[in-house]
Curated annotation (Swiss-Prot):
Coiled coil: none annotated. Functions in trans to modulate the level of transcription of the flagellin genes and several genes encoding chemotaxis functions. It is itself temporally controlled. This is Regulatory protein FlaEY. InterPro entries: Motility_Chemotaxis_Reg, Quinoprotein_ADH-like_sf. It comes from the Bacteria. SUPFAM superfamilies: Quinoprotein alcohol dehydrogenase-like (SSF50998). The gene is flaEY. It comes from Caulobacter vibrioides (strain ATCC 19089 / CIP 103742 / CB 15).
Length: 954
């Protein structure tokens, strides 16, 4: 047996903790030295209030911070201890609230009260810490950093494009999709001159059409034309697969490598892709997943996924490589924070715009394309190219809840989205009687973007009760028409008072000379029951509204006469000088009601949309009414709910040219999306039984159908299934020339735009008017930094430098594919504290910037200390808000609060060690010695002694 002197080991640990001889029993043995007075910490006391008492006092409204609750009978105790203990006790109360919220049997009502108390406590603690003055250290509610680098920024300029996987196999395999007479054109514009290069694979002759051979051929063509742009093969090595055989995992070799095509562009060469033969392309979004996997109605445990699928239209040939008519071109699963796609529309350039509702923690993430989701739910505008690549995402930036309900795209590429919002929406132009930021009552909102995806304006208009915008359409002269429903009068509304629950309305907005939204009119209409606008179409000065009024499908025609003026407006030019420039805009408009038409009862159905195609009006939806008031029926209803498409004159009072076709099976079939192109209609929705003779695929299927409205013939249809056997298509959009040989190469049609907006409010969830604060000394004056609509990273960096008195060094850095801000001290003597904005305007999370203290450091006596010679800094890392309403939120809250409490304990130990002269290496220094020994050191020595007793059998 190996033996040793345990007293020697104990002496070592006593020296490590500053306890020897009489000092080990808590009595100073060195009266000639200055006495260090270290009080017992509250977390070491047996007299701490139980958690239930902390919860009760917090819910009763008692203050969280109480310096008087932690007094010591010891004389000479530093005031720092009292302030630290007050902070700790407040955090301990937060911890008790978070723990209580997760206990069994806690009602939703109590959770709500706990949440309110927690939010109050967070605010109180933050205010206390931010104004705290300590002698030996500094506390911050944020982090402690040598530099603060953002995680969210603006996209870097990249001049490359990588397709999705085109083939899985071996490097020298011939690619099936390259067979046949496959060709496309590339137009290259360089220094104002445009040249076209034709890629016709038949020119390869007998050369095998492998990925490498095809790329070599295309590069030869580009080089011969004198261009720098080239192509390369993107190869991803395949991975072994693991399968279960008789309950045991068995590894199998990879099926092959994945091969994609990469376009390596040049900054001075603009590329436009086209094909000699095209066909319509159909884009369908689908929501899939079992809504109740545990079969318990009281739980909300459904996990859903959203997909975007591209089909080539049936009945037309898209040319070789375009895919079989009615064939699937691609199907992609979208980011999990997309809870639902409400509407999709194709643009004139062939791109696909989608309006999506996004929510936090759907798949463990809290962002949409890197942009943090501020509230429980938000609205996102997503733009994809024809190959399914996301070009940009624009989030609304609501801090509470928002829902997207309509989307419109103008011929010039301008985009508008509309819906409902509750809570705060920073940067919006508000109506005169909107609901407050703290209200859960919804208001209508409309946001307009330019062709680059930069927000032009957002308007929020509401009444005293709930309202929402449900339909949009662009008109001439910059007018945007908005339809919706409201439970109370909207500002400036005219028309008969229907006095129903929900009343329908039609409004119009234009951009005034200063670039702000201007309401032109608001017309209300409907019945004494519930009414709502379903869709709007515009034909010159005619506006046709499709609405559901007391269950009836209604059409209303209006004439709009705008007053367009040209006025001189003073604006700031690109050189920073003001100048007077002429601006043409719609100043006023008058609305005249025209014909109305009742299409019949929907009997529980809905109008899915209105379309104008070939000079005729199309109405799509679903109904249980087998006698709709539309003439010229080409097919009969099938029973239950059926889809329908009606075609009629734009003069809605003229019924002579009516055509009606039903689509459905013996069960109930709904229509959730509707599109028309060249006289052909596409319907998507939930499928019932025996729909078009196709058997059920999953538990609850969806469908896609291509219908010839003139004959009623179904040119092509397909049942759709998805995750867990549940799927419902939610939108459909058609591009008249979106399918072509380009699909074989995974390339998008149209001009490949490598540029991205450099505006902060476009690339992030930040809103104009959002803020954060900066100060350069403890308890110093706070300077507010405000985000403007046109701010870039560079202009924001200049603002931060000025706000810090140029004590901050602010530069742009790289984070993945984004450029972000990086803030650091301009000198060793500079300290910058970054704090959240007030009043719900905080922008730090939207920029991925951590609040806290940024300072230079140095190493001194084994410790990392501030380079300016000030005391240590401790960061509590407390966010402005924590969530107790969900399990994930409670788990996060407990983690955050525990981390903050740990920082306070560390701060206590550090100043106690300093007072007792204990260094990091276990030796004693010239600090204060003697005096009362703190309890945490006694506990450490007791633990060491107990360990030695176990080792030696003592």
């Amino acid at each position: 047996m190996i033996t040793f002197d345990s007293s020697a080991l104990l002496s070592y640990y006593q020296a490590r903790t500053g306890l020897t001889g009489a000092g080990a029993s808590g009595v100073s043995a060195s009266p000639s030295r200055s006495k260090a007075v270290v009080p017992n910490a509250p977390w070491l006391s047996n007299t701490s209030p139980p958690a239930s008492d902390l919860v009760r006092t917090a819910l009763a409204g008692r203050k969280f911070i109480d310096e008087g609750a932690n007094t010591s009978s010891l004389k000479g105790v530093s005031a720092d201890y009292k302030k630290l203990f007050a902070t700790y006790q407040a955090l301990n109360t937060l911890s008790a609230l978070a723990t209580r919220a997760g206990e069994k049997g806690v009602t939703d009502g109590e959770v709500s009260r706990l949440q309110t108390a927690l939010s109050k406590g967070l605010g109180e603690i933050s205010g206390y810490v931010q104004n705290l003055s300590l002698d030996q250290m500094r506390l911050t509610t944020g982090a402690v950093m040598t530099s603060d680098k953002g995680t969210v920024g603006v996209p870097k300029a990249t001049y490359s494009y990588t397709t999705d996987t085109l083939y899985t196999g071996q490097f020298d395999d011939e690619i099936p999709r390259f067979k046949g007479n496959v060709s496309f054109d590339i137009s290259v514009k360089s220094f104002g001159v445009t040249s076209t290069v034709t890629m016709d694979l038949s020119e390869m002759g007998a050369t095998p059409r492998t990925m490498s051979n095809v790329v070599s051929y295309m590069n030869g063509k580009m080089k011969a034309a004198g261009f720098n742009t080239d192509f390369s093969v993107q190869r991803t090595v395949g991975q072994e697969r693991t399968v279960q055989v008789n309950g045991k995992p068995v590894k199998l070799p990879a099926t092959g490598d994945d091969f994609a095509l990469r376009v390596n562009g040049d900054s001075v060469e603009q590329l436009t892709f086209s094909a000699p033969t095209t066909a319509p392309a159909v884009y369908v979004t689908t929501r899939a997943g079992d809504p109740d996997p545990d079969k318990k109605a009281e739980t909300d445990d459904g996990v859903f996924e959203t997909t975007l699928t591209k089909y080539s239209a049936a009945g037309t040939a898209g040319g070789p490589g375009a895919g079989a008519p009615g064939g699937k071109v691609f199907s992609e699963t979208l980011q999990g924070t997309i809870s639902s796609v409400r509407k999709s529309v194709t643009g004139a350039d062939g791109s696909v715009y989608m309006l999506a509702d996004v929510s936090t923690a759907v798949d463990g993430k809290t962002d949409i394309n890197g942009q943090p989701i501020k509230g429980e739910s938000d609205v996102a505008l997503l733009k994809y190219d024809s190959a399914g690549h996301l070009l940009y995402a624009r989030s609304l930036g609501a801090t509470d809840n928002a829902s997207g309900l309509s989307l419109a795209v103008a011929s010039d590429g301008s985009v508008a989205v509309a819906g409902s919002v509750s809570g705060r929406l920073q940067g919006a132009v508000n109506g005169p009687i909107n609901n407050s930021d703290s209200s859960s009552t919804t208001d209508s909102f409309v946001t307009r973007y330019d062709a680059k995806g930069d927000e032009q304006w957002t308007v929020r208009r509401g009444g005293l009760q709930e309202d929402e915008a449900t339909a949009l359409a662009f008109g001439s002269n910059g007018v945007l028409y908005v339809g919706g429903r409201s439970k109370s009068d909207l500002p400036g509304s005219v028309g008969t008072d229907p006095s129903g629950g929900w009343d329908a309305y039609l409004s119009a907005f234009a951009t005034d000379g200063n670039g702000q939204p201007k309401a032109l009119f608001t017309q209300k209409f409907g019945t004494a029951e519930n009414d709502s606008v379903s869709d709007i179409v515009v034909n010159g000065s005619q506006v046709i509204v499709g609405s559901k009024e007391n269950g009836q499908a209604m059409l209303r025609s209006f004439e709009v006469t705008p007053s367009v003026v040209t006025e001189n407006v003073t604006k700031l030019n690109q050189y920073g000088a003001y100048e007077s420039v002429p601006v043409t805009y719609t100043k006023t408009a008058t609305l005249t009601a025209g014909a109305t038409r009742d299409l019949g009862s929907l009997k529980g159905g809905e109008i899915a949309g209105l379309k104008i195609d070939g000079g005729q009006l199309y109405v799509g939806g679903y109904t249980a009414n087998n006698l709709m008031s539309i003439g010229g029926a080409t097919t009969a209803p099938s029973g239950g709910m059926d889809g329908f498409v009606g075609r009629m004159s734009l003069d809605i009072s003229d019924t002579t040219g009516d055509t009606l076709t039903y689509y459905g099976g013996t069960g109930d079939d709904t229509v959730t999306g509707f599109a028309v192109s060249n006289g052909t209609a596409w319907l998507v929705g939930a499928a019932g039984k025996n729909l078009d003779g196709e058997e059920t695929v999953g538990t609850k299927d969806g469908y896609v159908a291509q219908v010839n409205v003139g004959t009623g013939a179904v040119d092509w249809s397909q049942r759709v299934t998805g995750k867990d056997g549940y799927a419902t298509p939610t939108s459909v959009a058609v591009s008249s020339s979106g399918a072509s040989a380009l699909d074989a190469f995974g390339l998008p049609g149209g001009t490949m735009d490598f540029s991205q907006s450099n505006r902060i409010v476009s690339a992030t969830a930040a809103r104009a008017g959002d803020t954060f604060q900066i100060r350069t000394r403890e308890r110093g004056a706070l300077t507010t930094v405000t985000i403007d609509a046109n701010d870039t990273l560079e202009t924001l960096a200049d603002k931060i430098k000025r706000a810090s008195g140029f004590r901050a060094k602010v530069e742009t850095a790289t984070n993945g594919n984004s450029r972000v801000l990086k803030i650091s001290p301009a000198s060793n003597n500079a300290t910058i504290e970054i704090m959240p904005g007030k009043g719900g305007t905080d922008v730090l999370r939207s920029l991925g910037i951590a609040g806290g203290v940024v300072r230079a450091t140095k190493t001194e006596d084994g410790k990392t200390v501030s380079a300016d010679g000030s005391g240590p800094v401790y960061g509590l890392q407390l966010p402005p808000e924590l969530d107790l309403t969900t399990e994930a939120g409670r788990k996060n809250a407990n983690m955050v609060i525990t981390r903050a409490m740990s920082q306070v304990r560390t701060a206590y130990r550090e100043i106690a060690d300093t007072a007792l002269g204990i260094k990091n290496d276990g030796t004693t220094g010239s600090g204060k010695t003697g005096g009362t020994v703190p309890a945490y050191l006694k506990n450490q020595v007791a633990n060491y002694q107990a360990a030695l007793n176990r080792l030696t059998g003592g």
